[in-house]
Amino acid sequence: MTPEIITIQPARVPNAVRMPLWIRQNLGSDAHYGKTSDAVQANRLHTVCEEARCPNRGECWSRGTATFMLLGDTCTRACGFCSVKTGKPDHFDADEPRRVAEAVMALKLNYIVLTSVNRDDLADGGAGIFAATLRELRLRDATIGVEYLTPDFRQCQDDAVRIIMDALGELPDGARSDLVWGHNVETVPRLYQTARKGSKYQRSLDLLAKAAQQSGVEAKSALMLGLGESRAEVLAVLRDLYSAGVKRVSLGQYLRPSLNHLPVLDYIHPEVFTEYEHEARAMGFAWVKAGPLVRSSYYAEEQQGDTHA
């Protein structure tokens, strides 16, 4: 039976349901957790693990992996679900790519996820920093796996794709020339006006389609559930993503960062996530992760070596 479609409520309203046991998770305290934290702080960097209060931070950091957030810690948009601070960024750090690469080398990672805040104040949306970080990483380690999780590059998608693909094509002989390019649609189209102000569903699909068309690039996206979307809406988004050329997808539970953010309307049972995973695989997605604590970069390192040439 299709669940009732619920209209999302404004911030400060209590969650509609209590958090179930399957959601709760302790912060990791493995020795590698401290090593990852130290490397991030020593290089004056930001991770989405911290800024977005990811529930898997302890687990991932204890494995010695992290998702580095480029272009500072201030976003030019204000999505209703996100805890990253918003405002007018006060600087542009051209040295950030070098410091990210040095932190990655210090941690001896073989797969790195790079994301960023939205920087609508920049002509290229920040694409140049993504490209420069890719170069810095593969100049130091020609075999390192790199995954992007980019904004939608509003007003400059074509330029952003060109900048990034130029960097990929100019790497030294012997360096990997592949890339996973992720961009999250986050939610169903009906909820964009409330959950993703400043973003457009079709714009996100357009970027994913452009990324999927590039040689050596595999497109990836993610959905968070629990904002009142219906099963039919979720399946429709999965079909749209697959039609756009996306081959990798993840689905996870929305967890409210604070009372100033959108309330959780439903906690999706793990069995329902399993059903969505089966549906996505049946549609043809090559890689699927679905579960309450899954995030777009969760166990991303498992994917390395799978991108097409």
List each model region and its residues:
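Conserved alpha-helical substructure of the radical SAM core
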Residues: 86-113
